[in-house]
Curated annotation (Swiss-Prot):
EC number in record: 2.1.1.72
Remarks, miscellaneous: The DpnII restriction system has two different methylases.
Taxonomy, superkingdom: Bacteria
Segments forming a coiled coil: none
PROSITE patterns according to UniProt: N6_MTASE
Organism this protein belongs to: Streptococcus pneumoniae
Pfam families tied to this protein: MethyltransfD12 (PF02086)
Complex formation: Monomer. Homodimer.
Name used for this protein in its record: Type II methyltransferase M1.DpnII
Keywords for this protein: DNA-binding, Methyltransferase, Restriction system, S-adenosyl-L-methionine, Transferase
Amino acid sequence: MKIKEIKKVTLQPFTKWTGGKRQLLPVIRELIPKTYNRYFEPFVGGGALFFDLAPKDAVINDFNAELINCYQQIKDNPQELIEILKVHQEYNSKEYYLDLRSADRDERIDMMSEVQRAARILYMLRVNFNGLYRVNSKNQFNVPYGRYKNPKIVDEELISAISVYINNNQLEIKVGDFEKAIVDVRTGDFVYFDPPYIPLSETSAFTSYTHEGFSFADQVRLRDAFKRLSDTGAYVMLSNSSSALVEELYKDFNIHYVEATRTNGAKSSSRGKISEIIVTNYEK
């Protein structure tokens, strides 16, 4: 594939990811500071805003190691990743999916290379129920096979374009707790937090994007980090659910109410229009 062909590809998420921000991009764009220095996204997820902005100098992070490995392999081994995904596409079936899914139960996953692990996750997210990433308490992937007639498992042009973009810019890829991702934030930098949301009801479970979860204590710790970054002179933006708890946590900052469309969730009732909050430490 020629570089000039790659440049025509619009950068966008390479995988489905729960809580993705594609539907909210028009609103978020209106709230972004006009100019900023370095870009930080400590909960990058599928990277909808990251790819939309395509910053030249950025730090991206997530606490999901399997997801971050996908970013790393797209950067380092795009062609090998594409070839493995082509094999998954050729053999795609419910039986094939369930066999590959069980690799984290019978220790086969420990024998896989990093690029094989990335291809496994990307394949499963493309063909499973609603594109969910969900693991049980043993950190075993447990989402059933989806019912797609002709899923696009390999997007060769997009993977190649993302690889070129990451390699041609000053982009640092991290994995771990959000606080580790913001240690280098300085005055004039822009930080976007998109954490697992505070549930709107007692029956809403905290996310299982990783088997550790994200507690209310973590939400408070995040609010404290938001305040510290604000005090350093950084531009800070955060997304969360439209709830009284979020309003209370961020009462000292600017709160914007928006409507988002959710397209993936374990229950059909969790999809559709929902209210969200975007918090900024600056006026727009």
